[in-house]
C-alpha cells in the first residue's frame, strides 16, 4: 500500500455543465476550495475558488452566474498513479504551481490529494524537522481596514492574491479578507433588491464586478473591516512547522500569520510546507 492510499480522499465533484452559481454554493456548503469537474462521471478538470474569484472580478461578460457553465473556466486536472510516493507528488505540485492532484488507479480517478493532505503527512512524518521561520514568507500584502471594499478588491486583483491582511491606524493586524468572504458578500448583496436596483435573484457577473469595483457599487460604500474575518490564526516564528500544519488543518485554512516579537512578520502557508518537504527531498 502506497503513501497515497492513506492520504487521498474521494473527490467532491460537479458536472461540467453545472452553473457557476451552483459551484459557488457547493464550495461554501462543503467549506472546500476546489471541486473536480466531471463529464458523465469521467474527470475532465478542476475548479478552485481562486479561479472563480478572479473570473467574477475581471470577466467582461454580462451573463448571470446561472448561465455560465463551469466548463468555461475550469482548468486541467493533473493526475498521478496511486502507486506514486508523496515526495514526488510534492515536486509535481511545486513545479506546476497547483494545489491538488488527481489520483488514478487503472486510469480511473479514485481520489484527489491536496495541499491539506500534504500538510497532514508533514505533521505526522516530519515533526521537529523545521521551524516556522525556516520556510515562512516574509512579505505579505496588507491594507488599512478602513479602506473601502472596492479598494481592497482592486488590490487583490492587481496582486493576483486570494487573501489580504487588514490593519488598523496603529499598524496592528485586525483581520483578513479572502475570496470566500467576498463570495458571501456577493450572494448576500445579490439577493438584496436595494442594491444597484437589482431585482433579479440571479447574480450576474457584471453585477458582481460592478458591485465591488464601480463608483456606484456597494464596494465603494462598505468598509473592508465590515466583512473581514476578525479572528485569524497565527503562530510564533520559532515554533515547529508541524504545529503550524495542525493549526491550518484544524481551522480549514491555507495559511496563518507568523508572529515575530509579538507582531505579524509574515505568513506561513501550505505551499511553504510543500517547500519544506522539497528541502528534505533535496538533502537526500
Language model region names:
Residues 1-10, 48-78, 90, 114-142, ...:
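Tandem CBS (Bateman) regulatory domains
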Residues 7-11, 20, 43, 76-77, ...:
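Short glycine/proline-centered loop/turn elements that form peptide/ligand docking sites
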Residues 12-22, 41-47, 78-83, 107, ...:
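Short N-terminal helix-initiation segments at or just after the protein's N-terminus
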Residues 13-31, 38, 79-97, 104, ...:
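The conserved cystathionine-beta-synthase
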Residues 27, 35-50, 93, 101-116, ...:
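A glycine-centered beta-loop-beta connector
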